[in-house]
Structures are given as C-alpha cells and as structure tokens.
Amino acid sequence: MKFDPEKIKRDAKENFDLTWNEGKKLVRTPTLNERYPRTILKYGKAHPVYDTIQKLREAYLRMGFEEMMNPLIVDDKEVHKQFGSEALAVLDRCFYLAGLPRPNVGISDERTAEVKEILGDIGNDGVEKIRQVLHSYKKGKIEGDDLVPEISTVLGVSDALVADMIDKVFPEFKELVPQASTKTLRSHMTSGWFISLGALLERQEPPFHFFSVDRCFRREQQEDASRLMTYYSASCVIMDEGVTVDHGKAVSEGLLSQFGFEKFLFRPDEKRSKYYIPDTQTEVFAFHPKLVGSNSKYSDGWIEIATFGIYSPTALAQYDIPCPVMNLGLGVERLAMILHDAPDIRSLTYPQIPQYTEWEMSDGELAKQVFVDKVPETSEGLAIAASIVSQCELHGEEPSPCEFPSWEGEICGRKVKVSVIEPEENTKLCGPAAFNEVVAYQGDIMGIPNTKKWQKAFENHSARAGIRFIEAFAAQAAREIEEAALSGATEHIVRIRIAKVPSEVNLRIGSIAQRYVTGKKKKIDMRGPVFTSVKAEFV
C-alpha cells in the first residue's frame, strides 16, 4: 500500500518502535486465493529445439562462419544435377509440391439464371463482370483467396452471397484435384548449398565459410522415436582451394566441443553418396558424459552425431564451381535430445501432443490448482474471516459447549455480532482436522496436519497450497454472513462437521489437476473432522 513518507518520518521521530511495528499494517494481506503458490511470476521458456538452434548459431559464429539462408524449395532437376544416378532414390524421399489447377469456367444461360437468383438482379453487365473476373483468375492475374472479394467488389454485393453463389453454381471449384509440380521441399541442406554457392561466385571470390541452420523435409515411411518427416539441419561449408578432410575433423571438434563433447572418432561412411568425393564421406562419433549410463543405446557415451565430406567435382561442375567444398551437417533434434535428456524425438519436438508425451505435473503445479470456492467480497467480510481463524487458533482446544465473540461491527449496512461456537457437549471448539493444511505430495492432493509424520510433504513450500481447512471454512462463513446481511436475516449459523470431499470444506480443485490426478490413479483426499460453527446475530 502507498504511504506518506513525511508522516512516517514524524511518527518515527516521536516513537520509533511503535512506528516500526505498525509498518506491517501498510502491507496488504493477500486473500486466500492470492497466496503463494497461486501468486506467481511467470517466465517464458524456449523450445528445446529452438534453444539448440540458437546455441548452434552462436557456436558457428564464434568459429568465424557467416550465416546464410539457402533455398527451401528446390526443383527436381537440381537434385538430378547434384546426385546423378542417385537422384531417383533421393527424390523418392522428397515431398513434391502440388497445387490446384484453375478451371476454365463457363457461364451458360442456366447458370446465369442461378447467379441472378442468388445475387439478385445484377443484369447482363453483372454477369459479364463475373465472367471477366473468372477469366482473370484462370490467367493467374487474380489469386484464389482474392476471387470472392473481387467479385463482391465489382458487383457491390456481400462476400457471403458471392461465396454461396460460387459453391452452388460452379461445382468445378469443389471437384479440383491437386496437380504435382516439379518443385520439391529440400530433403538435404546440400540441395540449397549448391544453388547458393554457384550464384555467389558471380559476385564474390572464395574462400568462404558459411553455415545455415534450417528446416528440411524427408518422406519417411513412418515417424518414430528417432526420426520425423521434418527436421532441422545444422550445416556448414568451407570453399577453399586447399580444403581437406582434416578441415571436416577440425570443424567437428570445434563445433561439438562447445556442447560438452569430449572425444571424437571419425569413420568412413558406408553410404558413399555421389555428391561427395569417394572416401571423403565421414561419420563423426563423439563422446558425451551425459550419455553415460543413460537408458538408451548410447549408454557407453558414444553417439553418431554428424557427417562431413568434400563435394564431388562432378556435382560442383554442374554449377560452374571450380573450387573444392567441405560440407558438414548434423541433425539439430539429435543434439537437442542429448542436451535436454529427451528419450523420444517426438516428445522433444511436440511436448504439447498427449500421444507423444507422458503427462507430468510437479507437486508445485498441483498446489497452484487448489482454490477457496466461496470468498468474502467486502473488506468487512475479510475481517470477519480473519477474526474467525484467530479465535479458533486461540481457543480451538477449549472444551464445549463454548462461545467466543470474534467480530462486531457493520457489514452491508447492518450491524452484526459474530461468534465462533460449539454447542455440543464433551467436545472442543474445533475438531482435530480444523488446522489441516492442503499439500500436494508425490502426485496426491491432501489435507494433512503439519506433524512429524508428514515432515517430508511440508518441506517443499512450493507444494503447500497455503490454505488450512479452518481458513477455507472461515471464508465461506464470512461470505454467507454478507449474503445474510443483504437478505434481511436476523441470525445466521454456518456449521462444518466431518469433511469428506473438497467442497465440504469450501475448497475447489482445478479441472486440470483433477484430470491429472485421476489419470495417474492418484488421490484427492480432503477428509477429516473439522467440527465447528459460526453464528452471526444481526441487530
């Protein structure tokens, strides 16, 4: 709360200790539903794949490479130029781009009548305008998503009517079948490097050191724990007259060492792709301590992480490139799986999709899903709730029957006297579960006493909901007293006995937590004998 510094200085000069102690009155008391852990400061989190991409970009830049964006859409003739006799095998793994053809639509007398029936009397001039727009669409002068707005504009009718007219009068648009083009989505970054380097030589001279971290597409038979149909490749090239295989080894070590890899092993790749010079295509195996003992086939710490080679002159010559080029590439997702301890590439990439990811909520997240249902809406109501809790804390062990005044004043325009009571004999003001606190522990949400038995559960403050049964009940009692004051009642009594479910102690569990707890076969346990009552007497 805001305060007057000058007043504080004056008061402190007169009585420092009193002013210091009263400082706590200037700090607003949060409502039950505002208490930590429900009051949080959220922060953004990078996706693990994009986080790894950024780290790779920074690593390449530190090594002196310049970033380049390569063509993503590649004509299949480029693949033939680059891969030679292997082109068909490569293209079998490529996605071809297809598009809908643009039909040649005629407007007969019958269709003219249908158009006028839907759009109204637009006259022969209106029909001619439609014919001209459709002709322009066929010629490619108007894009498909502009067709309806264009007709709407020239005729001065609504988009909805035009869309309805096209749907009913011109069925050709609904019968269109996509036609494949010769354009493909690149399956290797190599497809783009040849095009980029060939074009660059017209304006610059080597040596070149470039890198690109971007998306590739591969038509896999199916996606599984280790492969996706779309992935990110972190690729680099060095174009220099003196480039050798050793440059590939040096780049491998320089790049991967920045990610915690410690030892390297280079083996000839058995694939022998035709776009590499024979015997230069090399697999890079690297040792990472995080893999040691992992529940994977890489538990010895070694993993195949990258491939490099020297581009073949037979492929480079197709682009008039006269200089040797070393190319290295690695899959970003595989590196991200290591850095983020992910066992499945699908769950790493798409954690939001249930079929790929085991749902896990921490105890702290579950605790944030616990709320008090009915809460007072006035400052007087909040004061009543606080006074009820205070009296229960002071006199909870008092034998019954007993009654303790807790608050007196005006609420909602009426004077009221509030007391905590227990009319029954041979018991206490509060039952043994009154001061149970709501805690999330090992996936369960429970109302438990803060005793030695539950010490482990209470050690994690972020998993404590910050709500005791008596506080939730007091909030309900205060809210009902507000409502009773407005209704004109002369007396109102609120009782709680043995709680069996959250609602009986005025608690509400968020639907997400309920689904999680049920799905995990965990429990929500808010049972216990609370046994107390609150009486409000209106004057």
Swiss-Prot record:
Binding-site list for substrate: H188, M189, T190, S233, A234, S235, Y275, Y276, N327
InterPro entries on file: aa-tRNA-synth_II, aa-tRNA-synth_II/BPL/LPL, O-Pseryl-tRNA(Cys)_ligase, Phenylalanyl-tRNA_Synthase, SepRS_C
EC main group: ligase
Coiled-coil residue windows: none
Record-linked PROSITE patterns: AA_TRNA_LIGASE_II
DNA-binding in keyword set: no
EC number(s) reported in the record: 6.1.1.27
Free-text function comment from the UniProt entry: Catalyzes the attachment of O-phosphoserine (Sep) to tRNA(Cys).
Quaternary structure note: Homotetramer. Interacts with SepCysS.
Protein name: O-phosphoserine--tRNA(Cys) ligase
